[in-house]
Amino acid sequence: MSVQEQKKKAPRDNGAPDHMKNLHPLMLKNYGKWKHYEKVRTGVLKRVAESGDVLYVVRAGSPRTMSIITMRKICDIADKYCQGHIRFTSRANVEFLIGNEKDVEPLIKAVEKDLGWPVGGTGASLSNIIHTQGWLHCNLPGTDAAGSVKALMDELFNDFITENLPQRVKISTSCCSINCGGQADIAINVQHHHPPRVDNKGVGVCEHPKVVAICPVAAIRPSMADGKASLEVVPEKCMYCGACHGQCPSMEIRDAQTDTLSIWIGGKAASTRKGPSFMKLAVWGLPNNAPRWPEVGEAVKKIIEVYRTGARPYERLGEWVERIGWKRFFELTGFPFTKYHIDDFKNARATLNTSSHVRL
């Protein structure tokens, strides 16, 4: 292909855009040559380059779902103090990048006054809670993830603006059992307690092969109802995840009378110490009590308090539980231990303690 033909081609429009052109000038200048960073205070980091350049990072907790008016306020602050450079973290924190030390305090005051947001979330603190769409946008929410995050962060506000925990704590909330919020130290998920109810009239407009294929445990199969093609659920196989409802709204699994919330703990993605780990059930059957979810807030605060007093420095929540044993964890929290806490999946043997070292 000639040079002229290459110039006529449209710019690439797939994949991630080139991030280099959006970096702060100091980040671009010292790319790959950073020496160390220092903690100035909770929410403020000082990054020092080999060249001696210093870049300050101010982290503020955002509500994630924002109006265009709020976005313009963020941009105005960034234009005034950060040469127009900000970035969002994976947990919806906003990080303002500052090259001049004298602009740090004025920026913090502007964030707290104009946006009403707290500065924090670094080091051994509670980071912003990651959550799924909830009632705002998701097509199968059993609860409002965004609303529960607001209620929960009101209760845990001081842990965001101070570093008084043994190690960082990450919380996620998911509006359904599929757990789009991902692995976290503490995760709040919806629990359904019965298989989906099939509406034979409405299910006819759904693509049956897709609905059958999306079930992770092969609990859905074709059937006939009133002489027409339909679907049926095998109750013995169904694990009440609700994935089928996303493919076919006529397979309704949500139930305001029976749906509850559960709390899972010990998940992490970091490779430190024992490496990444999945979450395990801590407490289930909590009422889906909108709009403040007080029972969930009390349970989460109880977990954080026993972790705060019992864990060693730099020990993540799941690592602390593994060290003291789950029996001791249930004693400290007062949560009831039930048969539903025991992993009875067919491949559960890989997760069970098979050594002779048992804490009694």
Region spans (language model):
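Acidic/polar, glycine-rich intrinsically disordered N-terminal extensions of enzymes
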Residues: M1-V48, N288-A290, K302-E305, E322-E331
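Short glycine-/aliphatic-rich beta-strand segments at the starts of folded cytosolic domains
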Residues: P17-M66, N128-W135, F278-G285
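Small-residue-enriched alpha-helical segments and adjacent helix-cap loops
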Residues: Q6, L28-G32, Y56-H208, I214, ...
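A hydrophobic, small-residue-rich beta->alpha segment in the mid-to-C-terminal subdomain
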Residues: K268-A311
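Short amphipathic beta-strand starts and helix->beta connectors
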Residues: K39-R47, K73-G84, K268
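A glycine-rich phosphate-binding loop feature that marks nucleotide/adenosyl-phosphate handling sites
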Residues: T132, K170-S177, L317-F330, A350
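Iron-sulfur cluster-binding cysteine motifs and their immediate structural context
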Residues: R87, K210-V233, K237-L261
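Long C-terminal interaction/binding lobes of large macromolecular proteins
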Residues: F330-L332, Y340-L360
